[in-house]
Amino acid sequence: MSQITPDVVAAHGLSEEEYQRVLHALGREPNLVELGIFSVMWSEHCSYKSSRIHLKKLPTSAPWVICGPGENAGVIDIGDGQAAIFKMESHNHPSYIEPYQGAATGVGGILRDVFTMGARPVANMNALRFGRPDHPKMKHLVQGVVAGIGGYGNCVGVPTVGGETNFHKAYDGNILVNAMTVGVADTDKIFYSAATGLGNPIVYVGSKTGRDGIHGATMASADFDEKSDEKRPTVQVGDPFTEKLLIEACLELMATDAIVAIQDMGAAGLTSSSVEMATNGKAGIILDMDKVPCREEGMTPYEMMLSESQERMLMVLKPGKEAMAEAIFRKWELDFAVIGEVTDTGHMVLKFQGETVCDIPLGPLAEDAPLYDRPALSLADYKAWANVAPLGTVPESTDLGADLVKLIGCPDLANRRWIFEQYDSQVGADTLQKSGGDAAVVRIHGTSKALAISTDCTPRYCYADPYEGGKQAVAETWRNICAVGARPLAITNCLNFANPQRPEIMAQIVQALNGMGDACRALDYPIVSGNVSLYNESKATGGGSAILPTPAIGGVGLMLDHEVMTTVAFKDEGDAIWLVGGEGTHLGQSLYLREIHGREDGDAPSVDLAVERRNGEQVREWIAAGRLSAVHDISDGGLLVALTEMALAGNKGCTLDIALTTAAAFGEDQSRYVVTTRAGEVLEGATRLGTVGGSQVAGVELAALREANEAFFRDWMEG
């Protein structure tokens, strides 16, 4: 009797139609190993089956792009024979179930994506979304995630230099943990994943394989329910000290000519890495499962192929290089095993105890995997479904100062010192600007150059209008990178959405990608890598089912001379304060409206991409000419919040020469900056706002603003 029953198929996350495709691909019934392999390779996490046709519309090339999407990470040319290599990944579901390990292994996985390509990691970033602070589980989740990110990054010796953290009830039952790593490599020492060379040895290196993480990729492609906590065994366990050894061993071997191809074992472990390598090399692959280093007794081929144990890599070596490579990995106290070879069959064949336990043509697993053009509402129909209330009238504030105190103290704007003090941001001694500025800035060791990095997304905008929200997420990273004086070069993304089988959710995906694509084209700012995380919704809590659409963007820019870098802090008494980009008018979907009036109403602000580019290039020009002493983009909370953040950073107040309406004070119109110059300097096209000096902003003492800004995390974590 067959062991592949309809229940077994369903438990593997395959639809009846997909199972029929498996039968057609094999010309027979699969065994359990083969079914498991199809299951993980056809999961959303590995196949992008619901998003791939839309991802293909994104701009991915530019003269400085060396490698776009499709490899482990994106690669851009930063001059002088050097490249920046970077990517962003999600670890959402594991982090909700087991926050410390989920977040830690998210960091470990994205580090491997980057050093797999030959780069030494120089910076980690993150984008975190949590539910309401008063949700009974949220404090535990925040503490665990932050400790996991800090614990792993600090031990590996890669600085965590910034990120963003937001709170909203839509994430009560499904938090988001998106991790980003940036590395630097020589352009002539970049490694790819295409397995080539008939008979070349396939080598397993790193940690041993255990039973942790089995079906992690499938779990990441499913909704949450009340039983999700039972999936704790499928959360992987990370060991950052082993990862550090793995980085050093890989980079040492990469300095030789031994490696033909290399791939980390991430989602779907040995299955995904071997399939991707063989597919990219248009080859076949045969593996001897008896040779896989195992941590536990009696592991089956099914378990070995689907395990997501951490800190493991797969390589193809040149013939005769095995002994040299093994000596390097043994020196670093890591496992090393030749477990197979490259073939020309176009099949994945697995042997175990003398028998063939798997024989699958590679085409159906990868290039010919299911591809869905799922029904999506039009933007107009989506807005009708979302039913966001019109803005209507917003009463004029009777006390701008009191509103500012409340706003600067809300969870989304509160000082994040409690978070970033747990991250080692200075390891490596090249961090020039960290959390609290517009973008993190990391010097490229031994040069005058620096990379600027920013992660951004405003999910409330994306819910109200996913097209404008997608545009805005890209534009804000561009703006933040311009604000420190760097030229924005490329982005990575982490597309977090709910169930794509719902037309309204599919509309969010399609429209956000359309907006992102338009912004990238207008700003000459291509997408070079990314990740899609779907089914981010939970039936397990009362906090609403689907998350807000959250297309998190990670931007990277280049500064040729880091001496010109600007920061947000007010510098000298008497400096002139200027507004670039016009007065605020837009209160729809603003943080002010939500925090002061308890409303999430109105349209998202629109982004005029031509204005965005013009203003950003103008600010960069002024920075390069040495005319600006401080720069800050205007985003959440509008002008008064931006001024307050500059005042708190520089410990100097400001006096304003203009009367502020509520919309001018707190409106979130896009493409705007606050900048300061020396007294007497005139900025053409900018509006003079006032002067740096004193101890107040909007009539409120800096001490009161600082206390309000620092109270939330301090009181929450001590309470």
Curated annotation (Swiss-Prot):
Function summary: Part of the phosphoribosylformylglycinamidine synthase complex involved in the purines biosynthetic pathway. Catalyzes the ATP-dependent conversion of formylglycinamide ribonucleotide (FGAR) and glutamine to yield formylglycinamidine ribonucleotide (FGAM) and glutamate. The FGAM synthase complex is composed of three subunits. PurQ produces an ammonia molecule by converting glutamine to glutamate. PurL transfers the ammonia molecule to FGAR to form FGAM in an ATP-dependent manner.
Enzyme class, first EC level, given as a word: ligase
Protein residues bound to Mg(2+) 2: D113, D264
Compartments where found: Cytoplasm
Residues binding Mg(2+) 1: E89, N531
Any one Pfam family match given in the protein's UniProt record, by short name: FGAR-AT_linker
Pathway the protein takes part in: Purine metabolism; IMP biosynthesis via de novo pathway; 5-amino-1-(5-phospho-D-ribosyl)imidazole from N(2)-formyl-N(1)-(5-phospho-D-ribosyl)glycinamide: step 1/2
Protein name: Phosphoribosylformylglycinamidine synthase subunit PurL
Protein's GO biological process: 'de novo' IMP biosynthetic process
